[in-house]
Amino acid sequence: MDGESFFLRHDDDFFEATPWTRGPWNPKHQHAGPPSALVAGRLAEMLDDSFRIVRMAVEVTRPVPIGKLRLERSFRREGRRVRAMMGLLFDEQGKLVMTTDALAIAELDLDAAIREPPMDEPLPAESAEVRFPDFDPAPCYGSAMELRFARGSFGEGDVMAWMRMRHPLLPGVEPSPLERVMVAADSGNGVSQRLSTREYTFLNPDLAVTLTRPAEGEWIGLGARTDMHPRGTGVADTRLYDERGPIGRGVQTLLIRKRDQPLP
């Protein structure tokens, strides 16, 4: 990783997005992966080492601008085994742009008889590097993430892809396993797209991620499938991996529109 970053941190809960967060739908708006990861990492800061976040439920209430952001974070529940947190992200005008609910569980050592599923997909070293289509060539999310297809390709709707960050979320700070997962998981619909991004938009107003264990290493795998309905709705279902094997799942609800079709 070089010295660039997705965000600058001005204070504990005040941030500024850089052009590396730029998404594919509007040059003024962020891809939802970076702000989802930003909030996830800051919620994790509230926990001691005995707890680990295992679920993130993100709702994008309005497009997240490339600009200054303020985060409000709090506990909703502080149990001995389970803790629940909320993060509210606001733009510079004070408008709510993203809500996040996180669930953390206290970890402990269990019987070794519990077996983890093995890796059943090709690894990044065996996969072909590609670029996201139709992203602005200027600094953007598409150029800030390295992407490789292990199986399938754009337009097929059912793929296995690998992603890793070229830049950290914050300057000089190594991304956490949770941040690496969240910044990539929001691309499940992007890698498994069935329609051309030049003709259609398929935004996801939400993202739900559930994890069985922390990711290891830089690469996050997306075993993603998109299903769509002619009435403009869809679901992207993504099995999440690291190079050791499956680590969890991500689900996105899709809002599908033709680019030249006005909303009713």
Language-model features and meaning:
Residues 1-264:
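Terminal targeting signals and extreme-terminal segments of soluble enzymes
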